[in-house]
Design a protein with these regions (language model features):
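Accessory N-terminal region flanking or inserted into the helicase ATPase core
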Residues: 5-8, 125-240, 330-336
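Conserved P-loop NTPase-based nucleic-acid remodeling module centered on helicase motor cores
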Residues: 48-160, 164
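ATPase/helicase motor core of nucleic-acid motors
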Residues: 357-362, 367-499
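C-terminal accessory regions
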Residues: 619-701
Length: 706
């Protein structure tokens, strides 16, 4: 079989992934019998067979693609399926000895930092400089730290040394933009930002801590150029299949080029209408250069409403003189207020499903920016009508779950000097949560201590003390006999557990992770019969706690007098209470068939989901957020694109990029809907301002919903 690499290019839902799977099947069939080839590949120098390296744009796509490839060849050939960042992370950790040898670092196993931990440690490290040089309101400090850390990630993904970030900022952005976005009033803004980044990177490497930005830089700058590592790549893999390369970082192109240089059989797919992660860490135009080294396989199939109506839609939003009307497949749903729009949208979905026009799983509600009010309102109304909703990548703060709040309050009672983190209202909530032991006729957990009784107990039986808060005996409450036997028994059981655990902790210095695990097993009945969202929150809490104390242990190795254990627990509790950690643990549902439900998400989430539906509801259709990147665009991302280095990013360039993004978004969404688009418009937005975005012309050109 020819080893000429293949470049599969086509629009949304044109069959690119299917074609990639087909090429993989043909390649495997063309190889010697898989069992024989696997045995021949085994030797003393290479104990494992060379596998195929497969890339996918995100974790959801990765799992689906891995399943398709395995089914295509009935598991007869080994594959390694990763996202680009996942692969780089694994490689940096696997070949860490090569890195610390070249950098002269301490020989210690690296620890990957989660974004929230990275934020916390960087804020602490930069606090003196922020106070001295940067005039920031406290409310903007979080955003400032996040944006500076994102600069390191953008630079690493594009192959720019951290030392050059200040230069890129100075050349690529105006002083006005820097001051406006970063809220800095110093003349040497880029230099000071660069100093913060270098300080953070060096501090992290000394302690073996790896953030995403540091991982990117370590890979392209130190690991990938190492000839010993390159030899290992050649020994481990014999081909590469990369799906949706328009969502890959620039340094991925260098890796893929390396495989092409060594005549690896390679297949790539590229979507000109995609570029979903452009503005984050992706550099699709740079990746497209790989096409010049490949045999081009164009796919011209256009799916959904895009086949007939994409040009009409684009003409309406771009040409002010275009006076056409939209066909019957487009319907406008208009109200005055946003609240009314949410109710009317939910009602329209309920009516359509109840009347049998469309099934719930055939509907997607897509918004440019889905705020919590809209998410909650739509989910409450639809689920109340018996229509399930599947929110895409829902990331509610962990602290929004009452079980998590109760467990954090429990830590404040077991460990000393944490009384300020256990107010009376938190104690009352904890008593309610830990007394859920009865079931009603509808199989709902009923607490033995209801909120009223819990409030009375917290008022009379809780001893507030900053150093040693305690739950007193139930008879401390003069009218304890009015509480009832069930409430008193449940309260005494909780008190007995807390006092026993406190005694064990004082004797054996128990880790908070052990205390949390014991509380989940004994006070929450090991999570038995809890709904999935609560189980996910508990799993994420334990994963977060494990990660937090691993990092704490590493910091204590470098700084023995780092801080007291109570201060560490206090920081952990406050970190979660700030709401920066969400319930998004490693997925457990990938083998469970999802129930029929309405899909709900923002534009970025829906496009990344790479699905399609019969009906689309485009929420807030006239919002200006449709033509803006919003949260899917990081600050200063364009100045790190490989195709436009050292070009100043101007307002005109930003407007041009916004228009190009809007056209890609509309073409992409229209290809993902097959029957009807309901354009949901309210005259007033969330903030009460008029909604006059570019898609208003679509609303005006469509027939109104009856």
């Amino acid at each position: 079989m020819s080893i000429i690499p293949i470049w599969i290019e086509g629009g949304t839902r044109s069959g690119k992934t299917t074609a990639l799977v087909g090429e993989f099947r043909r390649w495997v069939v063309s190889q010697p019998q898989s069992r024989d080839s696997l045995s021949r590949n085994r030797s003393k120098s290479s104990p494992l067979p060379r596998s195929i390296l497969v890339f996918a744009a995100n974790d959801d796509n990765k799992r689906e693609l891995a399943d398709q490839l395995a089914l295509a060849v009935r598991g007869s050939y080994p594959i390694l399926c990763k996202t680009p960042l996942g692969f780089l992370t694994d490689e940096v950790i696997l070949f860490w000895p090569l890195i610390f040898e070249s950098l002269g670092l301490k020989a210690q196993f690296p620890r990957r930092l989660r974004p929230e931990t990275e934020q916390e440690l960087a804020t602490r490290l930069w606090q003196p400089a922020i106070a001295e040089f940067f005039q920031l309101p406290s409310i903007n400090e979080y955003r400032f730290v996040r944006q500076v850390l994102d600069l390191l990630q953008l630079a690493g993904a594009s192959g720019v040394p951290a030392e050059k970030i200040a230069e890129r900022l100075a050349d690529g952005l105006s002083e006005t933009d820097l001051k406006r976005v970063l809220a800095i009033n110093e003349q040497e803004t880029p230099e000071k930002v660069g100093e913060l980044i270098i300080k953070w990177r060096d501090w992290s490497l000394e302690r073996g801590l790896l953030s995403y930005g540091i991982i990117y830089e370590l890979y392209w700058r130190y690991l990938f150029p190492d000839s010993r590592y390159q030899q290992q790549l050649l020994k481990r893999f014999r081909g590469v299949f990369a799906d949706d390369v328009d969502d890959y970082p620039a340094i991925a192109k260098d890796l893929l080029s390396f495989f092409l240089d060594h005549d690896f059989f390679s297949v790539f797919t590229y979507n000109p209408q995609g570029k979903i992660r452009l503005g984050l860490t992706a550099d699709p135009d740079y990746l497209q250069k790989l096409a010049a080294r490949c045999q081009i396989m164009p796919l011209s199939t256009t799916e959904g409403l895009a086949a007939q109506f994409s040009e009409t839609v684009l003409s309406l939003i771009s040409d002010g003189n275009y006076l056409g009307n939209l066909p019957d497949q487009f319907i406008s749903l208009q109200t005055t207020s946003r609240a009314e729009l949410l109710r009317k949208t939910a009602t329209a979905i309920i009516q359509a499903v109840k009347q049998g026009e469309v099934k719930a799983e055939e509907i997607a509600v897509i918004a440019p920016g889905l705020d919590e009010i809209a998410r909650y309102s739509l989910m409450e109304i639809l689920t109340g009508a018996g229509i399930p909703v599947q929110p895409l990548n829902e990331q509610r703060p962990l602290i929004s779950c009452p079980l998590i709040r109760a467990l954090l309050t429990l830590l404040a009672l077991v460990y000393a000097n944490l009384g300020r983190l256990a107010p009376q209202e938190a104690i009352a909530e904890m008593l309610v949560i830990f007394s859920r032991y009865r079931w009603d006729e509808e199989q709902n957990l009923i607490p033995d201590i209801d909120p009223i009784r819990a409030g009375l107990i917290a008022d009379h039986c809780y001893q507030v003390d900053p150093e040693n808060p305690r739950l007193l005996a139930i008879k401390t409450f003069p009218r304890w006999d009015r509480l009832g036997q069930k409430a008193c028994t449940a309260y005494e059981r909780i008190c007995h557990w807390i006092e026993g655990m406190k005694k064990r902790q004082q004797e054996a210095k128990l880790f908070p992770i052990f205390v949390l695990n014991q509380a989940i097993e004994q006070l929450l009945n090991d999570g038995e019969n809890l709904p999935f969202d609560h189980l996910a929150a508990l799993r994420e809490l334990m994963e977060t706690a494990q990660h937090f104390w691993e990092i704490d242990r590493r910091l204590r190795e470098s700084e023995p007098s780092f801080q007291s254990p109570s201060e560490t627990i206090s920081q952990f509790i406050q970190l979660l209470r700030r709401g920066t950690i969400t319930a998004n643990p490693y997925p457990v549902r990938q083998f469970i068939k999802s129930s029929p439900a309405v899909t709900l998400g923002n534009i970025f989430q829906y496009r990344s989901f790479r699905s399609s539906h019969r009906w689309h509801f485009w929420l807030d259709c006239s919002s200006p957020l449709w033509e803006q990147g919003g949260a899917s665009t990081l600050f200063a991302a364009p100045i790190f694109w490989r195709e436009s280095p050292y070009q100043r990013w101007t307002t005109e360039a930003e407007l041009e990029e916004n228009q190009a993004r809007l056209q890609r978004v509309l073409r992409d969404l229209l290809a993902r809907v097959s029957e009807k688009v309901i354009l949901c418009h309210s005259d007033l937005g969330v903030s009460g301002t008029d909604q006059t975005g570019q898609l208003l012309s679509l609303v005006q050109a469509a027939k109104e919903y009856d």
